Amino acid sequence: MKLKTKIHLYTSISLLILLILVHTAVYLIFSSALTSKDAARLADETDNIAEALRAAETEGVALQDMLQAYLPANGMVRVVNGDQKAVMTITKEKAYKDFPLSFHSGETADVRKPDGKLFAEAAVPVIWTDGQVVSLQLVERLENTEESLFLLKIILIAASAAVCIASFFAGSLLARRIINPIRRLMITMKDIQRDKEFKTISLEGQSNDELYQMGLTFNEMAMMLKEHYDKQQQFVQDASHELKTPLTIIESYSSLMKRWGAKKPEVLEESIEAIHSEAVHMKKLTNQLLALAKSHQGLEVDLKTIDLIKAARAVMQTLQSVYQRDILLETDKESLLVKADEERIKQLLTILLDNAIKYSEKPIEMSAGTRNGRPFLSVRDEGIGIPEEHIPHLFERFYRADEARNRKTGGTGLGLSIAKQIADEHGIELSVKSKPGQGTAVTMQFSEQNGGGR
């Protein structure tokens, strides 16, 4: 069963059940009020007849004539003794003589429905002419009440039918209003599956309800998936391009070795050196690709309170011994405490320092401290600098401001992308300031609540 049919069916059935319950309650309450009023009226008339009987005894009026005067237009007056026998019955309709007979020792007023017809019956005890206590009974057919109840029943049925018909069309409109956005969503999803192209659905003219929010969420998800897909495609293309160059070099030098290596030692040595260099470059590239892939897996960051200055000194000493370069650290604090994953922060510092060393022959300067209550660490070199138009793209994968220079330094174009990922994991703001010929400064700015030091 389709969702539209289910909504239509459930709303119609629910409304129908509600109408039946409400209209039944209205009918029963109205019926009870009318019949109670009729029974009370008949009880009053019976009391009046009893008073008239007592007066008739003293005045010598014939009882039958007196009771005939109180006979309802469509009813019966009857006197029943204690032996359940009718002492006197006065009526214009013979059918009333078959009305159920019973003796009532007290006053009663009730409504009966023998043979599906509505009657009101009232009884009051009186003393008859022979001195015995009898039950004076007054019975009346409630035709007006029956007509009123029948009319009410017709009105309620007609009202129920009208409401059900209206609800049928209203339910159809409601179901269509609910289903149409879902149908558009399904069509768009099928189009995406068929065309292999991410699309969004139009939300114009829709109210800000749950269906609108569902469409908005779908559009955001589609755009996010498109962005990730495009990045993945670009990543594969860039990685293929990066691997193609060293593989081409290795293939060329291996062919050269195969042809001339045995005869020319200098060719053999040059080829081995080139192949080794490209193998090292490929290994570095592969390791950075793996590191970047792991960073996107949402691995949990082991946040602990660490001394940023101590971590910087450790990285600085390692790189000084590896590159035999001077790295200076300027700070007015003995320690600078931050909450971070120490190994990831050291990796971030290594990337920044490694980049600075590659593009500058002069000593590298680091500075650490707090600005406006926020811990920071800056890495500055006096190298060739970066043109302003390249700065916004520095953290993109495989981006190079100078392809030839980057190849010469052995860069892969992934280091700063990994650095940005680590910074994002820690809520660190990375900023770059650079001018061609004047050097570059990269600053790590921690959040305000993340720092403390002395």
From Swiss-Prot:
EC number in record: 2.7.13.3
Taking the first listed entry, what is the main subcellular location of this protein, grouped into a coarse class? membrane
SMART domains of this UniProt entry? HAMP (SM00304), HATPase_c (SM00387), HisKA (SM00388)
Domain of life of the native organism: Bacteria
Location within or outside the cell: Cell membrane
Q: Pinpoint the HAMP domain residues.
A: 176-230
What InterPro entries would the database entry show?
HAMP_dom, HATPase_C_sf, His_kinase_dom, HisK_dim/P_dom, HisK_dim/P_sf, Sig_transdc_His_kin-like_C, TCS_sensor_his_kinase
UniProt enzyme class: transferase
Which GO biological process categories is it annotated with? Answer: phosphorelay signal transduction system
Matching PANTHER family, A to Z?
Answer: SENSOR HISTIDINE KINASE TRCS (PTHR45436:SF5), SENSOR HISTIDINE KINASE YKOH (PTHR45436)
Name assigned to this protein: Sensor histidine kinase YkoH
Q: Which organism is it from?
A: Bacillus subtilis (strain 168)
